[in-house]
Amino acid sequence: MQKYADYIKQIEIESLWSGTKHILWNLDRRVNILSGVNGVGKSTILNKVVKGLAAGGEFPSHMIKGVHLKVEPEEAKWIRYDVIRSVDRPLMNAEMISKIDLTLVTELDWQLFQLQRKYLDYQVNIGNRIIAVLQSGEPDAAFKAQKLSEPKKMFQDMVDNLFKDTGKTIIRTANEIRFNQIGEQLSPYQLSAGEKQILAILLTVLVEDNQSYVLFMDEPEISLHFEWQKLLIGLVLQLNPNIQIIMTTHSPAVVMDGWTDRVTDVNDITIS
């Protein structure tokens, strides 16, 4: 059986660029924030690690030469992970998208489209678990069933709260993510860039289904307004308490809510 890591303990990169910059970064179980001036290699560090993780998360045999990970437990050979990037570029492969009858214009739209599929699967899985619990005949079956549905409700409450200034609310009876705004129905693709970004992050974390995941985020705050930047880390940890965040940022707002001690400067993990 595949043995999955709970989290990454250490990232070592022998040379970030050809023959220079040896990186050794010891990580916190929950929150790790990489800072530094532009061009110092923050995104490169994240990219080198992500590139070495196979699609299914198997890592020792795929790691780029000179990149080493220590994980907990040490014998684990697999990592569940997700990647959030900030740049919302126009879609390059429009041909592929045209086969799907939707107005997907940017990479973030495509990401949301894929997340909608995962969200449907997630709901089916939760529904099956709820049925199994209720059929078990255990005295606390109703309580257990309610606990299973709590993360989805928490996610919906979070999004409604974030979007309240524009009057948007999630339509809770719909299977897919859809919004109501003053009587009009909206799809996620009609949201603003910042709304799409925060929705994509929270939806990604919800469908992880409380499992141990590593969430790589490369400057996720770029299109988020100030208040959302401050809330970001707390919301992610609330939605999946078993997550480990490894992120880069330029924004002081992201760390304002009690995360300043989790900030690491690239220079501090560079061995000369």
PLM feature segments, named:
Residues 1-56, 172-272:
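Switch/communication elements of ASCE P-loop NTPase nucleotide-binding domains
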Residues 1-18, 24-26, 47-193:
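Phosphate-coordinating catalytic segments in nucleotide- and nucleic-acid-processing enzymes
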